[in-house]
Amino acid sequence: MTELLYNKSKAVAALNKVEGFNPLEFARRISNEGEAEQLYLDVKYRKLWFRLLNPTGKIISNIISLTENMAVVEARVYLDKCDQKEDCVGNSYAQRFRTADPKFGDKFLELAETAATGRALADAGYGVQFADVGEENDPLQVDAG
């Protein structure tokens, strides 16, 4: 595992800083078979971090497309609940398909929403700074946990 950008740059460590909350305490190491480990912050902790810093903020998700076997969801992050649609600080889409997996296969809509939310929060600075310097991020990691 390479050096964390969070540890290498004081500016990155100060991004969205909340006194008394250290996101690294909630991060975990994950890896796919045959790949190097990466540090990852689950979406539930990204949401917690966002709520601690922005108690009047909001996260809005919209179903863009939904069929029997596929869902596309958009998520937008706002610093204040009164912000207009175009004033989001993070925005992302995610697509998921129904699978044969007995635990998560039918939860493709929920997984798409979680992925879109995680990516939108990362876009707003809640999680991306934990990426290892020089490593590519796997977009499917937003579903972990």
Enumerate the predicted regions with their spans.
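Polyanion-binding surfaces on beta-sheet-dominated domains and ring/shell assemblies
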Residues: 1-145
